[in-house]
Amino acid sequence: MLTEEELIQIRRHLHQIPELALQEFDTHQYLVETIAGFNQAFLEVRTFKELPTALMVLVHGKNPQRTIGYRTDIDALPVEEQTGLPYSSTHPGVMHACGHDIHMTVALGVLNYFSEHQPQDNILFFFQPAEESENGGKRAYELGLFSGKWKPDEFYGLHDNPDLPAGAIGCRMGTLFAGTTEVNIDLNGKGGHAAYPQNANDTVVAAASLILQVQTVISRSIDPIQSGVITLGKIDGGTIRNVIAGHTRIEGTIRGLTQTMIETIDNRLKDVCEGIGCSFNMDVSLELNQGGYWPVENNPELTKRFIHYMEETPTVNFIETEPAMTGEDFGYLLAKFPGTMFWLGVEDDSQLHSATLTPNEKAIKRGVDAITGFLEYRMQN
């Protein structure tokens, strides 16, 4: 089994070679080479021409009754690192600012353990590219990567959390991450001179009305004890002060804790856009792009079992957490396979996606121990 120092060295190497979505070639090569150094007696490694930076490793069980999936993401963010660490990113403008280097290292630690201690059931490790963008989980599913013996019966995955103590495990019944949808609205009217509004059709005025009406969607269409949010964060219309704008674009996001909620918000937003178009006699087009960022809805039965194990294990600091309104594309895979996502505390003052994020490395070995323990427990229960 990998020692804590070996795990830390793996993490630091991965931290130095961050790569953006679908460009994780150095990362992929390092993962392949590292796994090649493990006991191969019951490992089967699979790569994919159609998704070149994806990687699957199947640990064949002694007497498998199921295949348990474990997923980690491998991509990084377009952030210029400002930690000043000796093992900082060597790729300018790219950083593991969301902790995917931690995720990968924990997965490698768990994989290494089961390469030396053959599990009862099959365990499928999925090293997924393109979580931050490009819909890596959805892309893998639609390409048919999860088929035959490579199809998990249940799926697990973690995300690091700087707000939790190092090595703590956080989870909850229900939704862990919100689903997110990108919103683009284009209003097309008629430009003209500011002195003659009767000869134009002002898209800025229509956009202002639309933005105000959108504020009622959550307050009047969503159950107040649930959480949903529409943020229209960008508006671009007009060119100069004395010209009426013939085109205005609004961009924003929708976030909701269930897929049903997101679909309700989507439909209400369509109604508002249609109504504004009729009221102002102009074309209003709405583009909604959710991609793979579905809500991360934990399976009730599996999550109850997961929480029970973590609560009853003396070496685990378990914390029940609130849902996060940020997104995670593991939600798409959990809509296809039952499973559970959870937090691993990394205790840092900086937040995810920050240029100064410095996870506490003591979390790595504690995470490996907690997850291997749970998987051993799951195979007996």
Curated annotation (Swiss-Prot):
GO annotation (BP), single: lysine biosynthetic process via diaminopimelate
Catalytic reaction equation(s): N-acetyl-(2S,6S)-2,6-diaminopimelate + H2O = (2S,6S)-2,6-diaminopimelate + acetate
Superkingdom: Bacteria
Short name of one Pfam family: Peptidase_M20
Pathway in which the depicted protein is active: Amino-acid biosynthesis; L-lysine biosynthesis via DAP pathway; LL-2,6-diaminopimelate from (S)-tetrahydrodipicolinate (acetylase route): step 3/3
PANTHER family: N-ACETYLDIAMINOPIMELATE DEACETYLASE, PEPTIDASE M20 FAMILY MEMBER
Record protein name field: N-acetyldiaminopimelate deacetylase
Organism this protein belongs to: Limosilactobacillus reuteri (strain DSM 20016)
